[in-house]
Design a protein with these regions (language model features):
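Conserved beta-alpha junction segments in alpha/beta enzyme cores
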Residues: 165, 169-225, 312, 324, ...
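Glycine-rich loop/linker segments at domain edges
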Residues: 20, 26-33, 159-195, 286-371, ...
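Flexible, low-hydrophobicity surface segments
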Residues: 1-156, 175, 263
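Short acidic, glycine/serine/threonine-rich loops at helix termini
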Residues: 89-94, 127-130, 209, 218-220, ...
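Short glycine-rich loop/turn motifs
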Residues: 48, 103, 191-196, 288, ...
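Glycine-centered tight turns that cap/initiate beta-strands
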Residues: 75-78, 231, 298, 507
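C-terminal catalytic domains of large/alpha subunits in multi-subunit enzymes
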Residues: 82-85, 226-231, 261-270, 322-441, ...
Length: 782
């Protein structure tokens, strides 16, 4: 059951378009198969295809490479290794450590060693199999525990301190400690990694790619080819999903395609088959976290120590910022008292793990929920009661471990409203009664909040540009630095532009993201797409509106600030003119109808040396109530009902926002339940295809799924006072994990906190049930 809100709050600054539910701009083309992705584009004449040879060893040194049979294979045009790279070998996005092709050392199973160019994709992939490569294996580091024992890290540790944890912990009436193993997650985008590189005259290169960060792809291609950035243009119309997996990890394949295209002066397409895609690209970071918490007789936290340990794989990639964000979010909505947070970036011989929706936030936030559950069961209280007692308030208990004051805190009101709308307390009583009389099926219930910080934690990335053209018939083209991966960014940008000028949405064309239109862009990540690019687009609109307003107002000796744009008309007092007619006047008056726009996020800063600052412009809030049923004989379970209340500020497009909330929740539920990454004892990923890696299916969707938007404008000056909606809903799924623990704990009358690692597969649920049953049996024999 789905609840859609057709219109936004009346406070939205809207005339016709913003604040209303409009279909995704590509929806009809996508469902009819007409939307073009990179692999759907008509191939240029004489287009060739590339394939990549991957290491079958996890750690070692290459002693000999024989590619003669590869070169002699049918249809092969070129074969390259790292020795054929004219420019930079290392394509690490921030810190070094990511060779475009293996450079003597093998760092993980599935590492690209060479690339082949052939006349067809099948011939290229067949040729790859003929390589003979000798590798001298070395001992691999496969776990966080091994990395810590070997002091193997990709970056230095980071610390946040508030007060004196040791003193307060020692003085606390109650003390608890625990640890939580948290699995990674495959992005499983429907469109895999793909790039098409087309060489042009004068060493120029045009690249079509499926990337969240075209400017980074442009930069790395230029460095690999040893040319200037202005020689490379990257075009990105749409992705078939990204989720962070195409923020940095798309660049390698684009660079290889461009290198082969440059060497052979032919168009080159490189598309990874699904199994290779899963082997060679990074995942959500697995974490192994530990906590110590001291609290009083009511369960109010007095002191907290959290140790965050991220499995980063073989190189830094974005791990520094990802572990930082896990640290920033290990408080969630709770005041941790005197706190000590430490974060470690562990190096292992796995693929370099990377960005994924939430960017470390989920792996940190789930620790807070684990702590609150443990406290509640220690005291025999309902977990919701303990959660409410520990919320940040608006007085003294309102400062995070990193020194940011939690302003405009909506958590308490959202929890109160959802507690009522979900009928939490009545259902809690009913579930206790049910469990008391049901020997096999046990039900669980949990209501958990979310507080998620919005901004890139790397300050310089919080900027965006746009380019707007108004044509003489009143239609417009807007280009911006954000990328469309199905989340509806282009739709919202189109709504913003249409709203600013008071014209229909159909008059606005949002063009493909291109590095020759808006330069030096930030990735579309950190839930910032609409916040940054929407403001930049609005800025471009305001510039042209000011020009038009001055032209029209001077005809009546009026103040240009009194001119309004609405309903395809431009009004100045009692005077009115059709928007198209004013555009014609501006053209004949030689007034520019083109403008750039720019925006940078205000107020944010963070001092890593002190671990203090304001890394986020604002917080997005939400809460979720989940009910599950668990079969205690098998560990199988079903999510029966979910109720969500989520804060999106003044929604620009309620239908898209609800869709993002639903999708984010289900994806988060998959991470917490069925999506298990498995490596064998030698470091090979064995859950490397859709048959062995289980994302949620339609049947896993809760039968009752209520989603509502919290109706309150953002207090900060975001675009139309809306809020980001990309990442925060992912963590609403924490309620499912907590509900599973609630059902398991019912075996002990809610006194034992289950040991349930993530993902909570049916096997792990069964083991957790068995552990409690064994403990109860032992206690009964004493």
């Amino acid at each position: 059951m789905r609840k859609l809100i057709e219109t936004a709050s009346s406070k939205v600054n809207t005339t016709q378009v913003a604040g209303k539910s409009h279909a995704h701009e590509s929806a009809q083309r996508q469902v009819s198969g007409q939307a073009r992705y990179v692999d759907d584009m008509p191939e240029p004449a004489n287009c060739h295809h590339a394939a990549v040879g991957l290491s079958q060893v996890t750690s070692g040194r290459i002693t000999h490479i024989d590619l003669s049979e590869v070169r002699n294979s049918a249809g092969v045009i070129d074969v390259i290794t790292v020795d054929d790279v004219p420019g930079h070998i290392d394509i690490g996005p921030v810190f070094k450590g990511d060779p475009i092709l293996a450079n003597k050392e093998i760092l993980f199973h599935g590492q690209p060693i060479f690339a082949v160019l052939a006349t067809s994709v099948n011939l290229a992939r067949q040729a790859v199999l003929k390589a003979k490569i000798d590798i001298d294996p070395t001992e691999a580091c496969l776990t966080v525990s091994q990395a810590k024992a070997q002091e193997s890290f990709v970056r230095p540790p980071h610390f946040m301190r508030k007060g004196d944890f040791a003193v307060q912990y020692a003085q606390s009436l109650h003390q608890l400690s625990g640890e939580l193993k948290i699995g990674g997650q495959e992005h499983m985008y429907l469109e895999g990694q793909v790039s098409l590189a087309i060489p042009e005259e004068q060493d120029r290169m045009l690249v079509y790619t499926s990337s969240q960060h075209p400017s980074e792809v442009q930069k790395l291609i230029a460095e690999v080819l040893d040319i200037k950035l202005h020689k490379v243009v990257v075009d990105m119309r749409r992705m078939g999903g990204g989720f962070g997996g195409k923020e940095t990890q798309a660049a390698q394949w684009a660079c290889l395609a461009a290198l082969l295209a440059s060497r052979n002066q032919v168009a080159v397409k490189l598309r990874l088959p699904r199994m290779q895609d899963m082997q060679a690209t990074g995942k959500r970071h697995p974490f192994e976290n530990r906590y110590e918490v001291g609290f009083d007789k009511l369960g109010v936290i007095q002191a907290t120590h959290v140790e965050i340990n991220g499995n980063c794989g073989h190189s830094p990639d974005l791990s520094d910022a990802i572990v930082d964000r896990a640290m920033f979010h290990c408080d969630n909505t709770y005041y941790l008292g005197d706190s000590y947070i430490e974060g470690h970036r562990c190096r292992t011989n796995q693929v370099s793990h990377t960005a994924y929706r939430g960017f470390g936030g989920p792996q940190g936030m789930i620790v807070a929920e684990a702590m609150l559950d443990a406290i509640a069961r220690k005291l025999g209280e309902d977990p919701l009661t303990v959660r409410l007692r520990n919320l940040y308030d608006d007085q003294q208990r309102n400062t995070t471990p990193y020194g940011m004051v939690v302003e405009h805190n909506l958590t308490k009101d959202i929890l109160d409203k959802l507690t009522t709308s979900s009928d939490y307390w009545a259902r809690r009583d009913a579930i206790k009664t049910f469990n008391a009389t049901s020997p096999i099926i046990k039900k669980g219930l949990a209501l958990t909040p979310v507080k998620f910080g919005i901004s890139f934690t790397a300050q310089h990335l919080n900027q965006a540009g746009a380019l707007l053209h108004v044509y003489t018939d009143g239609s417009m083209q807007i280009n911006h630095g954000g990328t469309e991966m199905g989340q509806g960014l282009h739709t919202k940008i189109g709504q913003i532009v249409a709203n600013e000028f008071g014209v229909p949405l159909g008059w606005i064309e949002v063009t493909s993201t291109r590095t020759d239109k808006v330069p030096n862009t930030s990735p579309t990540a950190a839930s910032s797409g609409t916040d940054l690019n929407g403001k930049a687009a609005q800025n471009a609109c305001i510039t042209i509106k000011q020009r038009l307003a001055e032209l029209y107002a001077q005809q009546f000796n009026a103040d240009p600030t009194t001119v309004e744009f609405a309903g395809q008309q431009v009004n100045c007092g009692d005077n009115s003119i059709a928007f198209v007619d004013l555009i014609q006047q501006a053209y004949f008056a030689r007034i520019s109808l083109s403008s750039t726009g720019f925006y940078k996020t205000p107020k944010i800063y963070y001092d890593r040396a002190t671990g203090q600052g304001r890394p986020f412009f604002y917080f997005a809030y939400g809460a979720s109530c989940a009910e599950v049923s668990v079969d205690t004989l098998t560990g199988e379970y079903k999510v029966e009902r979910v109720d969500i209340l989520h804060d999106v500020g003044n929604s620009i497009n309620p239908a898209i926002d609800v869709g993002q909330i639903e999708g984010g929740f289900i994806q988060g539920m998959g991470w917490l339940t069925s999506e298990e990454l498995l490596w064998d004892g030698k470091g090979k990923l064995i859950s490397n295809n859709p048959a062995t890696y289980k994302i949620p299916a339609i049947g896993d969707t809760p039968e009752i799924f209520n989603v509502a938007l919290y109706p309150r404008a953002n207090d900060e000056d975001s675009i139309y006072h809306s809020k980001a909606v990309g990442e925060p809903p992912f963590m609403l799924a924490n309620s499912v994990w907590c509900a599973l623990k609630d059902a398991i704990s019912s075996l002990s009358d809610y006194h034992i906190d289950p040991d349930l690692s993530i993902p909570a597969t049916p096997e792990k649920v069964y083991w957790a049930l068995s552990k409690i049953q064994s403990q109860l049996a032992q206690d009964g024999n004493k």
